Amino acid sequence: KPNMVLPGNLSNERIEDSQIVKMTFDALKKNVPKEVPGIAFLSGGQNSDKAAERLNLLNQLYPNKDWNLTFSYGRALQQDALFCFSKGDVLGLQKALLKRAKMNHLASIGQLFN
């Protein structure tokens, strides 16, 4: 369960999503055997939206890759739901978790914005 290639926490460098996706894919292509069936990304400190958007972009730009690319997010999947939970909003919690799960599913097949 890797993270995407991102600047370090202390870096002020701004990198476009397309460059993050390219560097991540290049690192995977160089180091992960094609026999590996799938790679499940951690969010690696990315916010919920960015984690999903970048996973989606990976799957859109590289549709013929050797492995399935998906998510294994904890914080990025639960963050919105936990905010609702902290306010005692059970219905909001359920809706937020369902929305985030659907978004990440769509990102894992490159269909987030379709």
Model-derived segments and spans:
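Active-site capping/gating regions of soluble enzymes
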Residues: 1-114
